[in-house]
Amino acid sequence: TGLGQIKEWIESGRECVPAAVRGSVHQMDIKADYLAFLLKYKGDWSSLKIAMDVSNGMASLFVRDIFGDQPAYIYEEMDGRFPNHEPNPLIQKNVEDLKKLVAETGADIGVIFDGDADRVMFVDENSRFISPDLMIAVLGHYFLEERGEKGYIHQDIRSSKAVGEYLAPMGGVMNT
């Protein structure tokens, strides 16, 4: 990541030389473009009963724009202190409230986002956690075979090599 090099540079006591040219900041509102991108993949989910744990994170900025009022939501308010649970759905105790919500509402699927909304994980209608590897394989199959799209499949570094082996014959190029 380069953090080790930065640490060494700081600890070495070398002088920090200011940049010759000052940078600038440009404010951009990309929400509309991002939503348009996401919504082009949304099918008709009206028959699905969805339970959703937004983990008090960044997904709260867009979940209602995509899913509307249909899902049963928990922890939808953005709060960087994450008062309800750590926003890491790979830790099973963080998924317990979603599992309860799925059972209480009779949902077909439970959806949980991590804090910065770059990962989403699922539980089934019986509140069983679905392996992220399985979801990558299913989604990869959908995009490669059903939609005929080509390109990289981005996966977590912890993902099984079996996912890439499954998707490679369909044209999937894995990227960790």
Can you annotate each of these PLM segments?
Residues 1, 102-124, 129, 172-176:
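Glycine-rich phosphate-binding loop
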Residues 61-65, 84-86, 121-125, 163-169:
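Short acidic, glycine/serine/threonine-rich loops at helix termini
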Residues 4-36, 40, 126-176:
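Proline/glycine-rich low-complexity loops and linkers
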Residues 1-105:
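Gly/Ser/Thr-enriched, mixed-charge loops and adjacent short helices
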